[in-house]
């Protein structure tokens, strides 16, 4: 904890480069309509706060470390809480994660509501079949909340890792990844907005425990902000893309009134029927704009008195041409039908091609739109890729999740020593913002990708973007991606698997490796392959391994002492106890006191 003014956050130390951060500039904070509600909260609670005010329903099954998201939401609902549209939401706990996702998908298919599930690790893999179907059915307004956790391999582990998020990549979700509780909350709101615009479901991820259980200062999105920013999921909006207008767009009042006349022609005088048809045709382009209903009143002269009530209802409730429900209904519980029947080969491939070309391809622009709108309302700036100190940097630390906050602290320390290092934090994992990443890496000597998974999917995405930029330098084949004639060298630093501790000295070592002549391409932070044992037996075994696997000698970096990154006035408190003695609750309470009563910047983490 460090001292601060009670109601004002000091600006972060600047540099020659632009800072793109989720914390608002203090000067801007007073100017925006929704600066946020000050609180101290962990990531799970910050996400649940958004869900409480937005969701019409949640179907979830408990799994560490995301369980608390649904628990907090259900506690709010069970105590009589309603969402910002004055609707009482529902919650259901099924018998497993596969059923949870299937049920959430079914609820979302009924339209007119924001629906969520919360899951992690094996829970996501268990429901993976339903996740693919959820993305393929163009379900808008659905957000999967993820507290990212490793998938058990050589043993069980419930701590942080990106295996589960990477497993979702081929499903087609739009995937966001926050670095702290503030970003987890803000990106949750952005995820609902982008999903309702694109009709592609979204996943909002944060690191398990490192963010989900980490308490820090949060500016909660106000309920009124969420109501204004997201909009009622049951209301009508203009279709925001050509493909959506073709598939979902209403045919308009002219078509619907003529459809009514076809079913009621025998109830009309023939001459009056023809006159009414001519009247509608003459005013076809004005019918949708008849909000004052003057044309409606004029039309009644030809409508039989006994069906004028039905005619008025048809007129008033006809949907405007080209509009759709904000979250479209794809099934009707009152008229059950089949979705996703069996298709033969050409139809199935055509459906995939249509989905990717006409719907998924629109996601990047809708994400940018959602982020820009949110920035305007809150002052908290978001981009698919956030950059810090990159404009003048030669060396880049690139990552995703809580590690990027750590990387910023280490980068600040290194820059004070004259070392030109910057940080790139990926907020939109899928679809991967290749052009933004290339612009951030343009002209750099080297980049180290910080990977919280052994599958190194983020490295693969970065390498693919670099390859396409190199192709574009010779012949433009990939629109929008800047062409690079020289590429930075890319290294992969695997860290934090299963919550493995990451210290500042490890990131300093990653930087030193990057600027060295050797620049090892793949290594593990915090792990040692060989010990300094004096045992002859151990030394003999180690020599065998070194001889058989010589590459492992360089896969662990030498580290020095931890640099001192905290301000001099900061205080640190550490609790030691055994389970059941209320230590975590005491730590949370102390964090609240330090922030709310003493006005200190506060952060706490259970171990």
Question: Locations of the language-model features?
Answer:
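Thiamine diphosphate
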Residues: 3-166, 172, 189, 208-209, ...
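Anionic-ligand anchoring segments at beta-strand to alpha-helix junctions in alpha/beta enzyme folds, i.e.
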Residues: 57-93, 365, 370-373, 377, ...
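Short, solvent-exposed amphipathic alpha-helical segments in soluble enzyme
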Residues: 74-77, 132-134, 192-194, 219-222, ...
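Conformationally flexible catalytic loops at phosphate/diphosphate-handling active centers
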Residues: 85, 89, 202-386
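Glycine-rich beta-alpha junction loops
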Residues: 149-150, 207-213, 401, 454, ...
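Conserved thiamine diphosphate
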Residues: 156-208, 229-252, 486-497
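Core nucleotide-handling region used for phosphoryl-transfer chemistry
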Residues: 417-446
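Peripheral docking tails and interdomain loops at the edges
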Residues: 450-562
């Amino acid at each position: 904890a460090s001292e601060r003014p009670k109601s004002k956050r000091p600006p972060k130390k600047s540099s020659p480069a632009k800072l793109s951060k989720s914390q608002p500039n203090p000067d801007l904070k007073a100017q925006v309509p929704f600066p946020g509600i000050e609180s101290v909260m962990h990531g799970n609670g910050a996400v649940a706060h958004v869900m409480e005010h937005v969701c019409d329903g949640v179907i979830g099954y408990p799994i560490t470390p995301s369980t608390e998201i649904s628990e907090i939401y259900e506690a709010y609902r069970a105590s009589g809480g309603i969402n910002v549209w004055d609707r009482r939401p529902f919650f259901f706990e099924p018998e497993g994660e596969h059923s949870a996702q299937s049920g959430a998908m079914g609820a979302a298919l009924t339209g007119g509501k924001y629906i969520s599930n919360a899951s992690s690790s094996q829970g996501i893999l268990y429901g993976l079949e339903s996740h693919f179907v959820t993305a393929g059915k163009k379900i808008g307004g659905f957000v999967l909340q993820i507290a990212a956790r490793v998938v058990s391999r050589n043993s069980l582990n419930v701590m942080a890792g990106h295996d589960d998020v990477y497993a979702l990549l081929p499903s087609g979700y739009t995937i966001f990844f926050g670095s702290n509780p503030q970003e987890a909350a803000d990106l949750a709101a952005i995820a609902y907005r982008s999903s309702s615009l694109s009709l592609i479901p979204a996943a909002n991820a944060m690191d398990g425990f490192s963010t989900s259980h980490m308490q820090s200062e949060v500016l909660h999105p106000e309920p009124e902000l969420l109501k204004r920013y997201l909009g009622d999921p049951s209301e009508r909006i203009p279709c925001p893309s050509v493909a959506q207008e073709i598939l979902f767009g209403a045919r308009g009042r002219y078509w619907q009134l003529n459809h009514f006349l076809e079913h009621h022609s025998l109830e009309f005088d023939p001459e009056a029927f023809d006159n009414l048809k001519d009247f509608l045709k003459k005013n076809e382009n004005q019918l949708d704009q008849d909000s004052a209903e003057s044309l409606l009143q004029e039309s009644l002269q030809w409508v039989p008195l006994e069906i004028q009530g039905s005619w008025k209802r048809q007129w008033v409730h006809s949907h405007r041409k080209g509009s759709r429900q904000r979250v479209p209904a794809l099934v009707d519980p009152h008229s059950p039908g089949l979705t996703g029947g069996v298709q033969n080969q050409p139809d199935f491939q055509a459906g995939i091609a249509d989905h990717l070309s006409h719907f998924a391809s629109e996601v990047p622009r809708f994400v940018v739109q959602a982020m820009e709108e949110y920035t305007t309302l809150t002052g908290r700036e978001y981009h698919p890729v956030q950059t810090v100190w990159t404009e003048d940097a030669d060396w880049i630390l690139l990552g995703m999740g809580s590690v990027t906050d750590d990387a910023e602290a280490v980068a600040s320390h290194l820059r004070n020593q004259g070392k030109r290092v910057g940080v790139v934090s990926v907020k939109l994992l899928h679809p991967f913002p290749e052009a933004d990443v290339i612009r951030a890496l343009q002209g750099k000597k080297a980049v180290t990708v910080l990977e919280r998974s052994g599958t190194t999917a983020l490295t693969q995405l970065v390498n693919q973007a670099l390859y396409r930029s190199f192709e574009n330098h010779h012949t433009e084949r990939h629109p929008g991606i800047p062409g690079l004639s020289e590429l930075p060298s890319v290294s992969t630093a695997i860290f934090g698997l299963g919550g493995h501790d990451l210290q500042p000295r490890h990131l300093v070592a990653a930087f030193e490796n990057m600027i060295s002549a050797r620049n090892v391409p793949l290594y593990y932070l915090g792990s040692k392959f060989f010990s300094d044992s004096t045992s002859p037996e151990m030394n003999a075994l180690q020599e065998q391994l070194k001889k058989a696997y010589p590459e492992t000698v360089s896969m662990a970096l030498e580290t020095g002492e931890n640099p001192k990154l905290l301000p001099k006035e900061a205080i640190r408190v550490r609790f030691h106890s055994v389970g059941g003695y209320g230590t975590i609750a005491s730590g949370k309470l102390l964090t609240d006191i330090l922030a709310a009563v003493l006005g200190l910047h506060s952060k706490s983490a259970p171990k």
